[in-house]
């Protein structure tokens, strides 16, 4: 069964030099903040790591969550911290994504 109003997103974060541990901490915090604010569903999260320490996060926005996140002070503060420690990269630019069967390592928190 699918939820036609929810949206699954895949985002890739490339850590800035020396900021790998900060990025890991932010990734631990990210989905709990979104859920606490009612912006993400309880779909089990998937967090992966690609070559170069790039973190790939898969989660599901609640209906309207994307739009509401852009007005939410807690989320905006979290995103500000993200931009200090990483660059977001396109999934298609990851070496793994160029393969027929993209393989990543699972990151457990």
Set out the residue ranges of the language-model regions:
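Active-site-flanking beta-strand signature of metal-NTP-handling nucleotidyl enzymes
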Residues: 6-14, 56-58
